[in-house]
Amino acid sequence: MQLNPAEISELIKSRIEGLAGSSDIRNEGTVVSVTDGIVRVHGLSDVMQGEMLEFPAGKDGQPSFGLALNLERDSVGAVILGEYEHISEGDTVKCTGRILEVPVGPELIGRVVNALGQPIDGKGPINAKMTDVIEKVAPGVIARQSVDQPLQTGIKSIDSMVPVGRGQRELIIGDRQTGKTAVAIDAIINQKGQGVTCIYVAIGQKASSIKNVVRALEQAGAMEYTIVVAATASESAAMQYVSAYSGCTMGEYFRDRGEDALIVYDDLSKQAVAYRQVSLLLRRPPGREAFPGDVFYLHSRLLERAARVNADYVEAFTKGEVKGKTGSLTALPIIETQAGDVSAFVPTNVISITDGQIFLETSLFNAGIRPAINAGISVSRVGGAAQTKLVKGQSGGIRTDLAQYRELAAFAQFASDLDEATRKQLDRGARVTELLKQAQYSPLSTALMGASLFAVNKGYMDDIQVKQVLAFESGLHQFLKTSHGALIDKLNASKAMDKDSEAELNAAIAAFKKSFA
């Protein structure tokens, strides 16, 4: 058979044209070792710190991803995000050229997701239009605005003595089983109708505990404006470490668009332990309490992203779509202490990063004072400027009464006969302590809280038995709602008390007291 050169060239041309070639040049490496979710990879020359690496697919047919953390001379140390049992020595690893990203946007509201933003609530896929990187630089000094708007938690002892402002970082610290999560959940429930989107990040908790939190939020109607990011105790240390940054990125989406968001990290002690585990497996040198040297930076770079940003920042970020609006991300990090030791490594770090702390004490909790907040050592460094005038006007006396009561109560144990003034202070302090008790999942509006504080400050509760104080308060609230609804609406709207309102409130409390038996 004679072959014509023209035919051969035509055949080669058609073959070349029909070739579906790929111009996808990817840096590839080989797995050298796999231990406890840590993979050593050889041959990745152009990998970035924090880059996503693509590993072979698992049982579900989806590729597994890892996070490059250690960049050494001839190998890369990476953590696998998720299952790693199917990865073996000699497998091919590819660079993706992307930093780890999670879905963001309003589509996530009302859903429970894992640390990578994948739904785990069985309600179908999340069709988020955007993704964003989990590691971002916090807003600079010029982009920030001072904290001067209140974020009401609805908890009397916090809003009166340790107020929180929008854009603040307020630490909740205490031993296990002192009600730390309950305080944070109450704060989320109280944001209903306040225009605040909430993100609850559960790190290293039991799946049953997270389920209970989600159920409580659903019953209170709070899931309508809340995203839950869950990294349970059964998930890898890498997922627990990443989850806080994922939640923060989801919150920043709202902050950068001139909206307000609240994020709860429950809790950062477990995140630090997860990071310690990852670091030790990567053979990084251990420091104090075996934590790596950068554990302070771990939390500071996370909490610095919670801020109030000014209108110029929002306008520049949205390219002029949103004008004249400031955005905020308020953080309530939780830290668990061991036997009340706040001088341990991680607690002291987070105390120094945050703008104040709420101390919860086991002794108060066991004595039935719940929320078990120690007002003496709890402080809010910037929230005072953001406190509502109504509560601020009534709370000065409360803090003084409590401080004097604690001091005198210690002496009164040894003194047999007390003068009249001391007796009065002890009685007032006992009533204030009783009044600051509050049931879980029952946050108060600004007006009702102001009315309670007003009543105790004006002496209306001085002749009521201590055990009757909460019943008096509950009855007063019901009376005000039914008979003085207009006054309550006015106080809630203005968040301040003028002379007319004060006179009406005085008359209302006096009228109720006559009927209270």
Swiss-Prot record:
The record marks S378 as: Required for activity. InterPro entries: ATP_synth_asu-like_sf, ATP_synth_asu_C, ATP_synth_asu_C_sf, ATP_synth_F1_a_nt-bd_dom, ATP_synth_F1_asu, ATPase_a/bsu_AS, ATPase_F1/V1/A1_a/bsu_N, ATPase_F1/V1/A1_a/bsu_N_sf. It catalyses: ATP + H2O + 4 H(+)(in) = ADP + phosphate + 5 H(+)(out). ATP binds at G174, D175, R176, Q177, T178, G179, K180, T181. It comes from the Bacteria. Keywords: ATP synthesis, ATP-binding, Cell inner membrane, Cell membrane, CF(1), Hydrogen ion transport, Ion transport, Membrane, Nucleotide-binding, Translocase, Transport. It is a peripheral membrane protein. SUPFAM superfamilies: C-terminal domain of alpha and beta subunits of F1 ATP synthase, N-terminal domain of alpha and beta subunits of F1 ATP synthase, P-loop containing nucleoside triphosphate hydrolases. Its main location: membrane. F-type ATPases have 2 components, CF(1) - the catalytic core - and CF(0) - the membrane proton channel. CF(1) has five subunits: alpha(3), beta(3), gamma(1), delta(1), epsilon(1). CF(0) has three main subunits: a(1), b(2) and c(9-12). The alpha and beta chains form an alternating ring which encloses part of the gamma chain. CF(1) is attached to CF(0) by a central stalk formed by the gamma and epsilon chains, while a peripheral stalk is formed by the delta and b chains. This is ATP synthase subunit alpha. It comes from Delftia acidovorans (strain DSM 14801 / SPH-1).
